Amino acid sequence: MRLLIDECIDQRLRLLFPAHDCQTAGFANLAGLKNGSLLDAAEAAGFEVLITVDQNIPDQQNLDGRTISLLILCAPTNRLRDLEPLVPAANSALGSIGPGRVLRIK
């Protein structure tokens, strides 16, 4: 599965998803794009899941009909030490996530 790590997340998080093709927004040349434009560009680049900590995206963007889904990591901060405990649940969730869906990992 092709995963895109949002630019507000520590890029080392990608190393915790070894079973997937995981890239950061910066590496994929998608840094600086805002929510709607980022989703459009990520879909066009073939990404299936955007991993983010931005819990507002589902309220700001309609995901109906999109091929990309959102995996929102709900942690106290976007630091790796706070996100790392959520990774096992995130990896499990990737097995059941479908296009246009939003999953929150707490």
Model feature map: region roles:
Residues 42-63:
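Acidic, metal-binding active-site segment of PIN/NYN-like and related structure-specific nucleases
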Residues 19-25, 66-73:
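Active-site regions of enzymes building and remodeling cell-envelope glycoconjugates
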Residues 9-13, 57-60, 90-92:
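Intrinsically disordered, low-complexity boundary segments flanking structured domains
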Residues 1-48:
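N-terminal first-folded block
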Residues 6, 53, 73:
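Active-site-adjacent beta-strand anchor residues
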